[in-house]
Every structure is written in structure tokens, then in C-alpha cells.
Amino acid sequence: MSERGLLIVFSGPSGVGKGTVRQEIFSTPDHQFEYSVSMTTRPQRLGEIDGVDYFFRTREEFEELIKQGQMLEYAEYVGNYYGTPLTYVNETLDKGIDVFLEIEVQGALQVKQKVPDGVFIFLTPPDLAELKDRLVGRGTDSQEVIAQRIERAKEEIALMREYDYAVVNDEVKLAAERVKHIIETEHFRVERVIGRYHKMINEELPLPLR
């Protein structure tokens, strides 16, 4: 039976560039994990593909899945639900495959309660002025929504202490390399690998004949 995979939880404020950094990580052939597509009730943006960028569902459909206990985590953010389907994550981890979750901060804290041995990585902007420029540059939100996102970002940055690692997204390629290095290092933590060596610890070897 293969070892259970590693759950990698990646989050940060809206507009910090989570999706861009994640795409950079997955653009290289050396990554050894699968991306877990999140589910949301927010409107589908131009160029987004259902089942690739997100699973887009109505509010009624999402709430029914919550009632059925089919979400690993979920959160309501600026009037929309975001969450992670439970079945896919468990099936993938049980196969020994690492799962990469890109989720909101509220959801990440829920996951930490259920899967405390996951790897929790917080992506932060260099400063709030840069974050505001990125939100304005997207051209998808009103000034009122941008102001809400900035205030929410302050609250989320204060929760950074709940994470294992913080990565500054000052340059996409560099941030992606930092995240990959963290994941690689986590695979060598003693508490993750000790199970492989139980047989070695208990094994008795015959002494050489003289």
C-alpha cells in the first residue's frame, strides 16, 4: 500500500496572485502533485473553464452539497461561496498523490482543523499599495468591492501566523520556486518518513562468521 499523499494548502488575499503563481508551478514538468479544483458560486469570468479553473455551481447546488457533508471546507467571501469537494481530495491522497489546494483563508483554517498535518503556505503581497494596483488592474471589480477586498486582506494577513510558511509574491517565478522548495523540503521531515524505516529499525541482521 502506498503512503498517503501530502495535502498542500495555498492561500492568501484576493488579488495577491495565487492563481498566477499556481499556474507557474504547474507549468514545469517536475511537479509531483495534482491541483484540486475548487467550487464556487461566483460568476464565471471571461476565459475561465468549468472544471478547470473552478467548478461553477448555483448557490442552491452548493448549499445542498454542504448539507450532504460533501465539502472538505467552504467559506462565503464577498457574497459568494468557495469550497473544496471532499471525495476527490481523499481519493487522490489515498493513492499516494500530493494534492495542491488553492483556497481562501477561511477555508484553509477549516482544513487545518481536519488535516493538521497538511502543509499550509500563505502568499502575501509586498505591500497593500501593490495589492490595490493588482486589484484595480484586473478590471473586474467596482471601487466598492476593491475597498472591501483591501479591508479583508488586512484581516487575512493578520491570520498568517496560523500558517506554516509565508511567501512574498514580489516576482511570480521566484515565488513559485519558493513554494516548490517548501513542498520538496516537507517530504523529508522526519515525522513524514519515519514509517518507511520501521522495518529497518526492527530488522536483525546475522553476524558475519569468523
Swiss-Prot record:
Organism for this UniProt entry: Streptococcus mutans serotype c (strain ATCC 700610 / UA159)
Localisation: Cytoplasm
A Pfam family the protein falls into: Guanylate_kin
Superkingdom of the organism of origin: Bacteria
Function: Essential for recycling GMP and indirectly, cGMP.
Catalytic activity: GMP + ATP = GDP + ADP
Domain Guanylate kinase-like residues, every copy: 5-184
Keyword Oxidoreductase: no
Binding positions for ATP per the UniProt entry: G12, P13, S14, G15, V16, G17, K18, G19
HAMAP family xrefs: Guanylate_kinase
A single cellular component GO annotation: cytosol
Keywords from the named record: ATP-binding, Cytoplasm, Kinase, Nucleotide-binding, Transferase
GO molecular function, a single term: guanylate kinase activity
EC number in record: 2.7.4.8
Family according to the record: Belongs to the guanylate kinase family.
Name recorded for this polypeptide: Guanylate kinase
Keyword Kinase: yes
